[in-house]
Regions:
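N-terminal targeting leaders
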Residues: 2-247
Length: 247
């Protein structure tokens, strides 16, 4: 709330109160107008209607509790979209997870169930105090980083998300290599069961004809076999084998 100072001036036996200046009146009206504009924007999303909005100049403060970080992010995004808003202060609380290990598992499942996370993408991450850090590389045919952000932000208990996901450059030669590698790889009895390319324990990142092998395979036989298949694929300039084995 904006508070206007009240001044009392003693003159002989009379006291006078300073009248509010025209500037303070106009400022209060501007604050009220901006507050109303923000409230209207937030009311378009039913989940955000419980938030309290206060305004001081071009600074807007949002206060309250929301169910997920996604809702919090939406509140901030909508507020910034209002004309006249310069800065936004968030005093929005999001419930924390009871068990961070369970939260980490929920994040992993959200990524695994994302239909467009394939063998050609690779993500790593961690979680601390509800803050999810995610980094890696994904193929460029769609905005996978944005879609993953939404999936993870809607998980109860997530407090924030730090995304450092690189979209690989579009490259027709790389696409051709992916097709050629998959044809060779899935002819092997060791890898044919992964033909769908979904939720594979290993990942193959192709960038400008350089191939990086990441993740896990059963043993050294599979690790060396995959490296050989990839290295013998016509057009591959170099293979970086970072595969780990389960035994």
């Amino acid at each position: 709330m904006r508070m206007t100072a009240r001044y009392t001036i003693a003159l002989i036996t009379l006291s006078f109160c300073a009248a509010p200046s025209m500037t303070s009146i106009v400022g209060a009206q501007d604050n009220a107008n901006l507050q109303q504009a923000v409230l209207i924007e937030l009311r378009e999303d039913r989940s955000l209607r419980k938030l309290t909005v206060s305004v001081e100049g071009d600074q807007v403060t949002l206060t309250g509790e929301l169910r997920t970080f996604w809702e919090k992010n939406e509140a901030l995004r909508r507020t910034f979209n209002v004309d006249g808003v310069g800065t936004v202060v968030s005093e929005i609380d999001v419930p924390v997870a009871d068990d961070e290990n369970d939260l980490a598992q929920d994040v992993v499942e959200a990524i695994q169930k994302y239909a467009h996370y394939r063998m050609w993408d690779y993500l790593e991450g961690g979680i601390e105090n509800g803050v999810v850090a995610l980094y890696g590389q994904v193929t460029p045919e769609r905005n996978k980083a944005r879609e993953l952000f939404e999936r993870i932000a809607k998980i109860r208990g997530v407090q924030d998300i730090q995304m450092n996901i690189e979209s690989l450059p579009p490259n027709q030669q790389d696409n051709s290599l992916r097709n050629a590698i998959s044809r060779r790889l899935f002819q092997s009895e060791h890898f044919e069961r992964f033909r769908s390319g979904i939720n594979t324990p290993f990942h193959i990142v192709v960038r400008n004809s350089v191939v990086t092998l990441l993740g896990y395979v059963q043993g050294d036989i599979e690790r060396l076999e995959m490296e050989r298949f990839v290295g013998q694929t016509q057009g591959v300039l170099r293979t970086d084998n970072q595969l780990q084995t389960l035994r």
